[in-house]
């Protein structure tokens, strides 16, 4: 099948009302980019059956001008009365629904195990087990509602998944992505790759790296960049694997240790492979570093615990920070960060530790120590503790994310240098 025009559609009145952010679309686009597909358009729709139906009809009519269209849609497959995706697709195709036996079994098991009134609960929840008749069923390994793949026209395929991010990501990787690669296998192969560049802005990256790359200027490769908290994600795509690899090598050479893979995936693998244990001592980030680690399944194998030493009494009482250190240098200082990291090593009995202490704002700053100042300690058992100073003059929530991501990067960097 020919290379498709890809459109990502998200449904949910919470999205169109601005109450929630559409993180699904960006995640899907990133995954598709890595598979060699480029999304041409994002569409966000409210929970309105008429609007959903008309938009799907409009997108289907694009097939008269495009050789092939792939629609990837999320949301509207749940048990409530405002979940209209299934209804809209069935009306557009003029078909009825059919039951997914796997989903039916999962929902029966789900309610029986929880001791609920089974028959009463099923009256509402049973809506989730149906798909348009004749569809390819996408099994849901995390939740209940299945997704489905169906044809809206001869050259228009629609893949629908639940809007819950955890369910959607697993369904995409396990079910939809393999189908996409198989269905469009006759297309020209595209290759992609990416790096995180730490403490870098999009404009600076374009000026000092992208603008000097002839292959990009000549259109032999396309590039993209997304700003994150503490880093940018720079990506490349080309029909030449050698060219993508060459661009990544140039990135690594130009930016050195600031150029990394996805450390949020790589670091857990390193810790598991090397059987390294870690812990945290956090002040200004309030446990966000610990949360980031423990968001990963299986993290208990290497993450022993975290101490949120927000008050100085916790710094002294649990981490063993000296009272004299706090009096002379203050809670936000190199000296305190060092003693926090070393105290975490002892208190938690781990191989490595991360400490962080800073001024998140909006108050608390002084002419000598401004809001945004933050110190990190990277402790290693029986080795010298490393101290790093950074300055993130951003709103409180952004500051905390910058600091948390930076602390994780600093641990990754030390482990790489210690290898």
From Swiss-Prot:
Naturally occurring in which organism (per UniProt): Leptospira borgpetersenii serovar Hardjo-bovis (strain JB197)
Recorded family membership: Belongs to the CinA family.
Protein name as catalogued: CinA-like protein
Cysteine-cysteine disulfides: none
NCBIfam families reported in the protein's UniProt record: PncC_domain
InterPro entries in the record: CinA, CinA-like_C, CinA_C, Competence-induced_CinA, MoaB/Mog-like_dom_sf, MoaB/Mog_dom
Gene3D superfamilies: CinA-like, MoaB/Mog-like domain
SMART domains: MoCF_biosynth
One Pfam match: CinA
CDD domains per UniProt: cinA
